[in-house]
């Protein structure tokens, strides 16, 4: 077997790969001859070249056809010329180990330490921490695959768990959150008559409680005028601190009461001396118009 020719095949692609494809610790290009037989267990160790090997090289070295990098998931192109076979290891090489290079390598190459020299014996141990373990094949996944991202999974899981946590409950509003016992009781305010401004109508459904002074002034006005004009009604309301509607309703009720007394008595009693005729029916209600001729019914009423 012509090892000089094989070394020339190895040297050419190694010198033309570029500085980013291999480690600084390169293996020597000349090897002592070996009588070991060619075996097929390391048939796919040519990881640096691309394309298929030539038939002549397969006959000389006894190696089967090399697999293209596309089948291994390595995205680097081939730098070997068309007339040369890809770089391959000598049969005297031991089992190879492949270690992925750093992130700066863009061609996705693997570091291939040599196991034949004593000066490079500890090289595989130095790179063993970041490698994929012993074996003739590189890992079946591209760099930064599931193995590299697995270390970030706990950190991402923690971030997701923090995002899914329920936010802190906001402080409850005191007026709406706290309900006291006295707030549950439905309270109906008492209906009390309040003095309204003159000229405004009183609320419906409320009974006005007149004072003694107001009743006295209204009775005096009723004895002289059973029907009031608009101007007189506004004047009386302003004097008695009432509104116009209250004065109007009081005079309506007072006229109805007078008619009821006339129907019950049959006739209007004669007016006492000194009293006007209009106030004859109301003689019993007037303290100034009393006479001994007044009927008992009118006095009691």
From Swiss-Prot:
DNA-binding region(s) from the entry: 203-262
Annotated InterPro entries: HD (IPR001356), HD_metazoa (IPR020479), Homeobox_CS (IPR017970), Homeodomain-like_sf (IPR009057), HXA1/B1/D1 (IPR046327)
Region (Disordered): 19-77, 127-149, 189-208, 254-301
Positions of short motif Antp-type hexapeptide: 179-184
Keywords on record: Developmental protein, DNA-binding, Homeobox, Nucleus, Transcription, Transcription regulation
Top-level division of the source organism's lineage: Eukaryota
PANTHER family recorded: HOMEOBOX PROTEIN HOX-B1, HOMEOBOX PROTEIN ROUGH-RELATED
Cell compartment(s), UniProt: Nucleus
Compositionally biased intervals (Polar residues): 19-38, 55-70, 284-301
Protein name in UniProt: Homeobox protein Hox-B1
One of the record's GO molecular function terms: RNA polymerase II cis-regulatory region sequence-specific DNA binding
Keyword Transcription regulation among record annotations: yes
């Amino acid at each position: 077997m012509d090892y000089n020719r094989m070394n020339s095949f190895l040297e050419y692609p190694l010198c033309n790969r570029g500085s980013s494809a291999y480690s600084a610790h390169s293996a020597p290009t000349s090897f002592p001859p070996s009588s070991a037989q060619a075996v097929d267990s390391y048939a796919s160790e040519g990881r640096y070249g691309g394309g298929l090997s030539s038939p002549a090289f397969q006959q000389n070295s006894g190696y089967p056809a090399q697999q293209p990098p596309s089948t291994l998931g390595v995205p680097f192109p081939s730098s070997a010329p068309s007339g040369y076979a890809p770089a391959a290891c000598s049969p005297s090489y031991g089992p190879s180990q492949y270690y992925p290079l750093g992130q700066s390598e863009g061609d996705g190459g693997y570091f291939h330490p040599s196991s034949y020299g004593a000066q490079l014996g500890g090289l595989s141990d130095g790179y063993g921490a970041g490698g994929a373990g012993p074996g003739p094949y590189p890992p079946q996944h591209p760099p930064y695959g599931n193995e590299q991202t697995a270390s970030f999974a706990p950190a991402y899981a923690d971030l997701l768990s923090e995002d899914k946590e329920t936010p802190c409950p906001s402080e409850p509003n005191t007026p709406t959150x706290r309900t006291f016992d006295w707030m549950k009781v439905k309270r109906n305010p008492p209906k009390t008559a309040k003095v309204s401004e003159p000229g405004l109508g009183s609320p419906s459904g409320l009974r006005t409680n007149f004072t003694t002074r107001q009743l006295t002034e209204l009775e005096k006005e009723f004895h002289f005028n059973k029907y009031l004009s608009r101007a007189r009604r506004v004047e009386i309301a302003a004097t008695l601190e009432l509104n116009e509607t209250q004065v109007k309703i009081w005079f309506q009720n007072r006229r109805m009461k007078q008619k009821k007394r006339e129907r019950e008595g049959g006739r209007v009693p004669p007016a006492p001396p000194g009293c006007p005729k209009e106030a004859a029916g109301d003689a019993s209600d007037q303290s100034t118009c009393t006479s001994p001729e007044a009927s008992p019914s009118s006095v009691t009423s």
